[in-house]
Amino acid sequence: MENIAEHFLHRFFYPASIALIGASENVFRPSYHLVSNLLKLGYAGPIYPVHPKQKEILGIKAYPDVGRIEAVPDLAVIAVSQAQTPGLLDDCIRKGIRRVVLVAGGFSEIGADGRRLQEEMAGRVRASGVRAIGPNALSPINPHIGLAVSFHALDRLHSGGLSLIFQSGLYEPRLRWLFHDANLHLNKLIDLGNKMDLNEVDALSYLVHDPLTRVIGLHLESIEGDPLRFLDLLAEAASLGKPVVVLKSGRTAAGAKAAASHTGALVQGNDRVFDRVLTQVGAIRAESIDEFFDLCRALERFDGLALAGNRVVIATMPGGEAVVMTDRVQQEGLTMARVSAGTLERLRPVFPPWDMPANPFDLGVTMQFGNPVTVFETLVASLAADPGVDAAHLQIPDLLLGLPRETFGMF
């Protein structure tokens, strides 16, 4: 795509103005944060809170309905109950709003009645040409412009190269942790919910071509878009050097049943086949939520760094972990590096006489009997200079976290 701004998702991430239907000034209500986040994060466009009774919300003029807003908002977030959502969607369509986010749950994920309501809304969206995220969704987030549609208080966002696609609010309880404690560097985030209109293929088609996206994290409970197009986009991302980390739930029969009750997802196909296909198109599958976020963060931080080869050194404090990591190296198709005789000679002075250095390195006893800083700096410098070493897995004890950055920049 030559001009990413022409993609229909672009204005979801860069809305010129926002209507927040269901916004509240009550700090104990989740919808309070719809307005407060935009103000704290510095969103620069007009904000139009919509509330049937309140005249003002956090110092901003409120409107009893979207029809009373003087302008036509670029994006509307409908954060009300399931029963109110269809009527307010109709109000947005009549107002001429072209992009909506439907926050409420209680549609296809609850069974036949909810599915019927969702299908009726989908028909009205298609007939009007409006594009919709959700229902059962809460997004988007774009740190570059201070945009955060969330029920959690966000004081700051760190912008970076990681873009995230979710099928549910899996990320929502972790938002403050991701941005504050885990220090996640985010480019864009979209929660697709029940995927009544926009789906994972739409999101990928935008982010794969987004020049600010360097890594993509994708959470799926089902695939609603064209499966071949989905795989083509994953392969295209790999060809562009954009890693895609996939967390797909519903792998077991029980998980598939839970997914259906959560977002109304139909989990298709054999999971082992899905696993192999992901490998063929160059995507990376995460086995757990923690691994998903760890992989996303690591790939974003080390973007542009490529291994010269597959020879790995392991150095840990307990020897047991070194054994576990040695197994993992083999499982991932890597090899244990053959450390040169010269490197081993440089390391001998910092190792006890009875503990000869070898890969994998067990540093527990060594650091007890020597200066831990000297041991670690000597190890890093020696391994970095060894032409037979392409990468190292180093376990860094807490007492060394204050070392200068130059120590860790030797590789």
Identify the role of each PLM range.
Residues M1-F411:
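Catalytic-core regions of core metabolic enzymes
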